[in-house]
């Protein structure tokens, strides 16, 4: 979630500085605020969920599927939100100056090295149904 938090901070800063339409900062516009609000909410939920599962693990109460659930959800939401926040930058999103494009690329890669979302879905499916869908 750290990459998403950085995307949120950079997007906020950019949106407050970038001026359009009668010299207003683009942060003034509803869709920019919605994108920031959605991303901030998902980051907060993800961090809180990770802390909770960490506490449960420390107490010996965490099930493996809890880890899969958090990894799957946090990686997916971080990528989705960073892509949405990237839209705020328009063409500047690919500039090295803002780093948001780098974060999106790195988050895309985490879909592979953190264990594909599909694999975590199968682990969760097994926990929910009691049936293993993979060999």
Segments from the language model and where they lie:
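Alpha-helical interface subdomain recognition
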Residues: 1-135
């Amino acid at each position: 979630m750290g990459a998403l938090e950085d995307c949120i901070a950079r997007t906020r800063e950019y949106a407050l500085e970038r001026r359009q339409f009668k010299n207003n900062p683009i942060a003034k516009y509803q869709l920019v605020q919605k994108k920031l609000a959605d991303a901030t909410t998902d980051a907060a939920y993800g961090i809180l969920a990770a802390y909770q599962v960490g506490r449960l693990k420390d107490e010996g109460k965490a099930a493996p599927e809890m880890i899969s659930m958090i990894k799957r959800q946090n990686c997916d939401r971080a990528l989705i939100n960073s892509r949405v926040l990237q839209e705020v930058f328009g063409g500047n999103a690919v500039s090295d100056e803002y780093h948001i494009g780098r974060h999106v690329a790195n988050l895309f890669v985490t879909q592979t090295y953190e264990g594909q979302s599909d694999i975590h879905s199968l682990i969760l499916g097994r926990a929910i149904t009691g049936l293993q869908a993979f060999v």
